[in-house]
Amino acid sequence: MRTFLKKIFVFLLSLIILLFGVDWLSSELIIEKSDFKLISKPKYLVLGHSQPEHAFNDSLIEGLKNLAEGGESYFYTYYKSVEVIKKNPTIETVFINFSNNNIAKSRDFWTWDCYYMAERLKRFSHLIQIEGKLKLAYHNLPCFTETMLFVLQERLSDLLTQNFGYSINLGGYKISSKLSSNTEQLETSLSNRLRVLNSFDSKSKKTSKHNLKYLNKLIEFCKKHGKQVVLVRLPQQQEYNFWENEIEFSQIRKQYFTELPFLDFAKFPLEDEDFIDHSHLSYQGACRFSNYFGKLLKTKKYHLNQKSLDHKK
């Protein structure tokens, strides 16, 4: 019996070593063959979740590239940004979205819930280092194992055929508008479910230490590579439920990020039609905000605290 168990252990250990070996080798080859250079050669980079994804229309802002993506925790933002920042020396300033919902405990859900993990591992697994993969495996082993087996199967096929023509979707500006009548009922149902979750989460006052850890890693990485970091909070309507953690949000910012410039646009003057909900801008709102932000960049005052700037559209 002992001999049998020993053989099982040796087999599993060998399998794990083989899988990690294939993962490491294929990841290195993919990174080597992938082109992370941004065609526009931007001076400014925007990172974050759905709020900046909907707010920064980079076609209206000279020298800026928006790589924000909805539902993205700082964990994935950090790993996907490393090669982009390394390979684009023209980037001088990185604007990172930092708002009330970024500190919420539910942002852990954005990292290792299977819906988010599976989708992002399939795109970014070659960018995530062993430390990050072990963390994902620890928090959701079934999803991690299933997804990585799928990824490695694809990778093995690519290794055998020498096919490394990868094109990675890293995020970007997303055009938004009011809901059309034929999708409004479905979207309203989903919105109501999310509102219940967000309402509970915003009132719990618990924070995501995990998400904040990777925000700090991202900041330190940018500094190490000579990039200025500016935190940005985007427009939010007064009815937005995450205003309830404003005290905690302010405390965390002052305790951990007080040395960084903070552009606070939370109360930026916009009309109701400039929003698609309480925290995301419509196409019209994004155009208004982006035009203002583009002018701000030209004044070179974006390194200042937003309290010293004029909030005129």
Language-model-detected regions and their locations in the chain:
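Hydrophobic membrane-insertion alpha-helices, especially the h-region
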Residues: 6-24
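Alpha-helical transmembrane signal-anchor/signal-peptide segments
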Residues: 26-44
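Short hydrophobic beta-strand that contains or immediately precedes a catalytic carboxylate
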Residues: 44-48, 281
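Membrane-embedded segments
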Residues: 51-140
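Acidic-and-aromatic substrate-binding clefts and catalytic sites of carbohydrate-active enzymes
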Residues: 72-75, 205-211, 237-245
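Secreted/periplasmic serine-hydrolase-like ester/acetyl group-modifying domain
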Residues: 111-217, 221, 225, 310-313
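Active-site segments of SGNH/GDSL-like serine hydrolases
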Residues: 216-242
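C-terminal regions of proteins
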Residues: 244-313
